[in-house]
Amino acid sequence: MPTTPVIEILDDSSLLDDSLIEEIISDNNDNVIHPTEIDESIEISIPYVNDKTAESNSTSLGNSQKESSLIVTQTASQRKRILDEILSDDLSISTDDFSLDAIPKQTSGRTRDSQKNDSALYESSQEKASIASSPNRLIKKSSSERHKKSQSIDSKDICIKSPTRKINLGVTESMQTDVLFEDNNFNNIECTQETDLSFSTATADTPTVGFKEITFKHKESTNEGLNSHNFSDSIFERQRLKQYITNIRDITETESQELYNKLIHTEKGLFNAVNQTPRDNFKAREDIIVDFSPSLLSFLDKQTEILKSILAPATIQKSIHDELPRIRFFRKCHSFYDLQHDFFFPSNYKIVEENTTILYFDSKEFFVKYKEDKRSLFEKLKEIERDNYEIILVLYDLAKFKRELEKIEETKYRSRVQSQIYDSQQSIQQNKVTTPQSDYGLKKFDVEQRLRYINREWGLKIHIVNSHNDFVHSLPNLCSIIGKQRMDPAIRYMRYAHLNVKSASDRKDTLKKTINEIGKVPDIKASAISDIYSSFQSLLHDFEAGSLKASSDGNYLMSEALEKRLHKIFTSTDPNEAVD
């Protein structure tokens, strides 16, 4: 009579081999009314150690089934009852040990037969694997809820080093449907199989967001003109032109047309005079008033007569403000500028201030103020800059100040050398004699660094002069530039500064220079074309008619490439389009 196999429990963790259990259940399926539900997810995920008893008993069980079906039925019932007791007693223990420390004690590197076939693992995992939301709950399997639970994974159960991780990754990587992660901090974060278990999903800033809805928004400037980048915008263009053109006024189309018609019929000469661009420096300085602070004007007392002569016909006056050695520029305005229509219309006499100002400092005095009271100096300069002034900082005697600093450095160096040669008492007495009384706390190298810093961080334009005479003789040039900038076409038409603009004497010269520029045509060939077509209008007329005139020798007047380029010029509506 065959012996009854015994199940030996080793380390409270050993179970029967899966192949043996499946063989017994499949052979005696008719005798078992309600098969006991077994948690096969744990069976698949954890290979148990010391399973020698089950392996040795598998042979005897196979022999016993051949001898008597009744004995086999009783044996199967006994084994199932013992197995139920083992599972009910040890299931909670095995689930509590789902940690990295517990796995080496209960498992080995041996792979079960059921895990060798990846396709079988995938099929069984799709039907059986489900993970609870808490480690303290029992892992259950239900045919009705199995598919729903496989579609949701709680964040607490997503552990990289969990023993069930091997099965879960196999399921999620091959899953065709989308996976939905539910967590307290990230509600309904939807992702596909390509983005499954993505770290970027867990670190999203928004609590509810879809991957397709993620967009990156750039912070826009509060300045509307800067956001639109439209140089034709009146507000943005006014802000730019106001720095150079004084007395700007916005008027409507009707008002501009009425003023223009009135002045053309009644005061045409006055209208032309206020719109004439001064080309002479003497003419440009007529309406300029140069305002000197009292201290600066008295400091340049010896240069006053020279200033009056070289700045003429500009007016020199004394300012009422004397906080800084400052020079300001004013203009006598007899007209206002219509920004929308680019006209200067005559108006009542008015004095306006230009945006350029000059600060004239002795180099030593400036760096002493910078070293002792930097904050006060910075606040005064920023107060001037707040009114949209272009500040020019003029320093004189900078080379002299550098030589003085170099001399101080040399004296200090000699003192250190002598202190090492002689004893301390002699060096102390000698230092009292040789050390200079004024130490500015600067080196020659520091001066250049400070000037670069002030130019970059404070926004000042720095100009160096060697003497008062150099500064005085440089003022007329600056005064002329300020006098011309209000009428300068390059400033008024800055919206077209990106275009390559060239001037011509007449229509024929304009056509000749255009052909020479766009077609790289030599001057002789361009002159031959302009002799036949005296203007763009005549050339356009023949282009529209579809027939161009021939040259004097009977050949084509221009090449096919030049014809295409001219045709693009005539038909294009985009001024920025390239002419190929």
Curated annotation (Swiss-Prot):
Cofactor(s) required, per the database record: Mg(2+)
Entry's localization field: Nucleus
Keyword set, alphabetical order: DNA damage, DNA recombination, DNA repair, Endonuclease, Hydrolase, Magnesium, Meiosis, Metal-binding, Nuclease, Nucleus
Domain of life: Eukaryota
GO molecular function: crossover junction DNA endonuclease activity; DNA binding; metal ion binding
Annotated GO CC locations: Holliday junction resolvase complex; nucleus
Main location: nucleus
Ranges of biased composition (kind: Polar residues): 55-72, 122-136
Pfam families given in the database record: ERCC4
Annotated region described as Disordered, given as residue ranges: 53-72, 103-155
Uppermost EC category: hydrolase
Matches recorded under PANTHER family: CROSSOVER JUNCTION ENDONUCLEASE MMS4, EME1 PROTEIN
Subunit structure as annotated in this protein's UniProt entry: Interacts with MUS81.
UniProt similarity note: Belongs to the EME1/MMS4 family.
Name of this protein: Crossover junction endonuclease EME1
GN (gene name): EME1
